[in-house]
């Protein structure tokens, strides 16, 4: 219940703008300005109680408290490490980022790319921080986390060994913005060791809020040049690199003056007419040095004399140091990898860019209810969350004669790095996209069933199921309606996720789920309608007061169930019996009369029939995945969120729902629906309750 309330509160705050870059969420409710002012007034330096300078902040295994790698480590402030520490000197450069004893080169490569764009860097690293003016030992940074911007506060105590920084550091040793940024990122992920191993695209996304895709240039898609052109038009960040095969290869220079292991940026893509044929050219920037390409289409290459002079002047006019052109074919031959970080519309302040249309949807997989696994598990796959994608407008320009709607889908699993210290790691995740059949077009209130997925193949799917934070793919499909199904590879894996869809044109996206519905059987009978046989049975069971209490009901039902071989049960708990009596006790006596007991008896017989029919494996019990079908048979339709709550409340640790809990669930639901209907006679879908009424209904 607390989790549901927290989600509702968070959704309301997000609707009011909390989590945007201008209104970043304060991580762990720590307010940078308030904490700094407190320290300045008290004349003390900040010590972060939420990420203290202790061994557990370093790691849990390789960097754990008893690891040899962490012996002799001292936490020191920059003022204790060098005589004149600086936060940032003359802007951020690559030399500010040198790797230490942590396997987070993926993160450092993303930080290096961040330094190429001052506007985006300033969003992540507020530059008005220093070790001189208003210094209080506290610094702050902003990261994108699963759809919202978060402000993270850290103190400036950094791990050192033999007087040197243990992790990231600047080349000259007196600049500390990168070390403090790494510490803030370690804090939000649980510890430094949680940063070991990852993809540069992950860092790209957390620094920009964009959606990052990458391409192996040895196997490029046929339309890659067009993808690059469109990405540049949209203001995306593009980086490329040449793989290294050994540590000795790092910074090695090829015979045509390209540097291996270097982060280059792609800044242009043009087609020019040369000697009667079209040539595709790529402009590359080497931000770190004077080394420039000496192959075809370099600055002094005769090939420039083969194109129109005005075109040559436009393309060769220098804008940035270290920029050079090369043919697209040489680009594919010499470089290994291209990364594109597609930025969100709010990141781009200029109106010159063609901006993506962005939609984000949050969801979760819950063991026993909505964690159905992949298509290899047909009995449960359909239980996964489902999302409708409605593509309406085709792209403005066709690629290679192919029309359609271009969109990117990124599925991110949340908070998995933070859970590494608890022994958890990344799930293996992926997704499928299914075409909606004509008969279901326009409907968003139907969760597609098991039979649909048994008879329909995926129109598209993620390239692979993989244990990375994000699975991302680019698609092009005709206008129409499609269902996106995200899943873990195996069923029963708990996890939270967010899905982001970047589309060329405006498209409609929303969760597909069953609407809440209760078709309850009404009993319009009088005592005169009850046959004599049942009257005699009731008189025998009820005793002298001619009424049945919850305790008497428990005894009666235990005897009945003991005779059933097809339902495993130890009888009903007194709690279930009290709920049944409350549901039908119309006169408030706390007991059931003849008519009330007759209605209950009829309901229990119906419940037994449903339970038996749903139990297809004849185990005498029901598993949590069968519960959804059972609820439908009983007249209830529920969205995924309610199924998660029901399984969490009524299933045991083996995901079994026994007959007692099955009946308790149905009776509880029926009672709640009847209360709501009584308080909402106009069927508005909302009711108002004061605190005492809310509490009375909640403790039913």
UniProtKB/Swiss-Prot annotation:
Tissues where the protein occurs: Ubiquitous.
Domain annotation EF-hand: ranges: 572-605, 602-637, 667-700
Record-listed N-acetylalanine modification sites: 2
Cofactors: Ca(2+)
Catalytic activity, EC: 3.4.22.53
Protein residues bound to Ca(2+) 3: 89, 91, 96, 175
Keyword Cytoplasm: yes
Cofactor note: Binds 7 Ca(2+) ions.
Binding positions for Ca(2+) 5 per the UniProt entry: 542, 545, 547, 552
Annotated binding of Ca(2+) 2, by residue: 229-230
Keywords: Acetylation, Calcium, Cell membrane, Cytoplasm, Hydrolase, Membrane, Metal-binding, Protease, Repeat, Thiol protease
Entry protein name: Calpain-2 catalytic subunit
Organism: Homo sapiens
């Amino acid at each position: 219940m607390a989790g549901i309330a927290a989600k509702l509160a968070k959704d309301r705050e997000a609707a009011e703008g909390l989590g945007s870059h201008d209104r970043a969420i304060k991580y762990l409710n720590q307010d940078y300005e308030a904490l700094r002012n407190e320290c300045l007034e008290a004349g003390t330096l900040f010590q972060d109680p939420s990420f203290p300078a202790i061994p557990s902040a370093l790691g849990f295994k390789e960097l754990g408290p008893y690891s040899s790698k962490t012996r002799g480590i001292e936490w020191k402030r920059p003022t204790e490490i060098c005589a004149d520490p600086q936060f940032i000197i003359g802007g951020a450069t690559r030399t500010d980022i040198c790797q230490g004893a942590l396997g987070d080169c993926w993160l450092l490569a993303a930080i290096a790319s961040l330094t190429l764009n001052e506007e985006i860097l300033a969003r992540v690293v507020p530059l008005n921080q220093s070790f001189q003016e208003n210094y209080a030992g506290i610094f702050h940074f902003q990261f994108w986390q699963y759809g919202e911007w978060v402000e993270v506060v850290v103190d400036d105590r950094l791990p050192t060994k033999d007087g040197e920084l243990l992790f990231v550091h600047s080349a000259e040793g007196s600049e500390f913005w990168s070390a403090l940024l790494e510490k803030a990122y370690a804090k939000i992920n649980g510890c430094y060791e949680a940063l070991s191993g990852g993809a540069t695209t992950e860092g790209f996304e957390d620094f920009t809020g964009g959606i990052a895709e990458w391409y192996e240039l040895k196997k490029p898609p046929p339309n890659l040049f067009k993808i690059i052109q469109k990405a540049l038009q949209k203001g995306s960040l593009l980086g490329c690199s040449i793989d290294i095969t050994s540590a000795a290869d790092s910074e090695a220079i090829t015979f045509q003056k390209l540097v291996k292991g270097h982060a280059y940026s792609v800044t242009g893509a043009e087609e020019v007419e040369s000697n009667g044929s079209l040539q595709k050219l790529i402009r590359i920037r080497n931000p770190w040095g004077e080394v420039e390409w000496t192959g075809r289409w370099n600055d002094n290459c005769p090939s420039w004399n083969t194109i129109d002079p005005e075109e040559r002047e436009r393309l060769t006019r220098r804008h940035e140091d270290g920029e050079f052109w090369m043919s697209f074919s040489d680009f594919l031959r010499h470089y290994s990898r291209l990364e594109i970080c597609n930025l969100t519309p709010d990141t781009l302040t200029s109106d010159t860019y063609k901006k993506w249309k962005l939609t984000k949807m949050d969801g979760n997989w819950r063991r026993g209810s909505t964690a159905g696994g992949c298509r290899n598990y047909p009995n449960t796959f359909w239980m996964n969350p489902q999302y409708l994608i409605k593509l309406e407008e085709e792209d403005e320009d066709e690629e290679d004669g192919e029309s359609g709607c271009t969109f990117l889908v990124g599925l991110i699993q949340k908070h998995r790095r933070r859970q590494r210290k608890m022994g958890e790691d990344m799930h293996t995740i992926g997704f499928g996209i299914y075409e909606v059949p004509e008969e279901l077009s326009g409907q968003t209130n139907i969760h597609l069933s098991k039979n649909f997925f048994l008879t329909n193949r995926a129109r598209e799917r993620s390239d692979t199921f993989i244990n990375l934070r994000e699975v991302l793919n680019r698609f092009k499909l005709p206008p129409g309606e499609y269902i996106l199904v995200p899943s873990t590879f195996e069923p029963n894996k708990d996890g939270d996720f967010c899905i982001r869809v970047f589309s060329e044109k405006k498209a409609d996206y929303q969760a597909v789920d069953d609407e809440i519905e209760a078709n309850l059987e009404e009993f319009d009978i009088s005592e005169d309608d009850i046959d004599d046989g049942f009257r005699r049975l009731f008189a025998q069971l009820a005793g002298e007061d001619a009424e049945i209490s919850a305790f008497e009901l428990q005894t009666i039902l235990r005897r009945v169930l003991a005779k059933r071989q097809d339902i495993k049960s130890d009888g009903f708990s007194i709690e279930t019996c009290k709920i049944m009596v409350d549901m039908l006790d119309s006169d408030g006596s706390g007991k059931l009369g003849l008519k009330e007991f007759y209605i209950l008896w009829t309901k229990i017989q119906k419940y037994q029939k449903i339970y038996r029919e749903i139990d297809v494996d004849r185990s005498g019990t029901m598993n949590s995945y069968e519960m959804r079908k059972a609820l439908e048979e009983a007249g209830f339709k529920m969205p995924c969120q309610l199924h998660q709550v029901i399984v969490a409340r009524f299933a045991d640790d083996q995901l079994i729902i026994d007959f007692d809990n099955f009946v308790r669930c149905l009776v509880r639901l029926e009672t709640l629906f009847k209360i709501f209907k009584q308080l909402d006679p106009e069927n508005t879908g909302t009711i108002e309750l004061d605190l005492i009424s809310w509490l009375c209904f909640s403790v039913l």
